[in-house]
Curated annotation (Swiss-Prot):
Annotated HAMAP family: Salvage_MtnB_euk (MF_03116)
Location of region: Disordered: 1-20
Function: Catalyzes the dehydration of methylthioribulose-1-phosphate (MTRu-1-P) into 2,3-diketo-5-methylthiopentyl-1-phosphate (DK-MTP-1-P).
Reactions catalysed: 5-(methylsulfanyl)-D-ribulose 1-phosphate = 5-methylsulfanyl-2,3-dioxopentyl phosphate + H2O
UniProt cofactor(s): Zn(2+)
Source organism of this protein record: Blastomyces gilchristii (strain SLH14081) (Blastomyces dermatitidis)
InterPro entries according to UniProt: Aldolase_II/adducin_N, Aldolase_II/adducin_N_sf, MethylthioRu-1-P_deHdtase_MtnB, Salvage_MtnB_euk
Name the record gives this protein: Methylthioribulose-1-phosphate dehydratase
GO cellular component assignments: cytoplasm
Amino acid sequence: MSAIKDERNNDHLVQSHDPEHPANLIPALCRNFYGHGWVTGTGGGASIKRDNHIFIAPSGVQKELIQPHNIFVLQYPTPKYPPSARQYIRKPLELKPSACTPLFLAAFDRGAGCCIHTHSQWAVLVTLLVEREKGLEGCFEISNIEQIKGIPKGKGKGMMGFFDTLKIPIIENTAFEEDLTSSLEEAMEKYPDTYAVLVRRHGIYVWGDDVAKAKTQCESLDYLFQLAVEMHKLGLPWVKP
């Protein structure tokens, strides 16, 4: 049986009445994110790992209109590069695989159960403010804000506290999404406890141990980014002296 025939005949992988099935969760998440303005104009994406399968939203599709039959499925583990080596076991032939795929795989290699990519305006703005205030090597930092408690300290280390300082690394954007992979992995190595990486003038990647954690961490971070922008307008420091 050919690889293409296999990809066409695995529709059962995305057919389920269970609302918690990845093929149902990804469209629901994308509709939710569209309402926040995070995935407008087909931007952004989401991916979920279940056992040895990776479910991924397609590229170039209006995210609020995604349906379960639009979802790609990869065998895991699978090579990041070259793209032709990736082991798709379901591939809607009329759609393009997500350009975020190798970045999602980098998160799954760190034990994540879900990875989310958004084009949040607040995320973009804080990367510009950090660049202006700290230069290209600076990271986003904020402390003494209650919502910080929604972010983990690191794997198995519990959640951050009110007096902790949250640090989110920032990497430079590239012309093509997949070219961000090495910089993302370098940031993961430099900040081993982080659950997110900002991309300057682009957006953010957020991951979590499961779907609920990735979603709530993404929400908490976006809240903090918006608050940081408003604090900056008022001349208030992000990190309390």
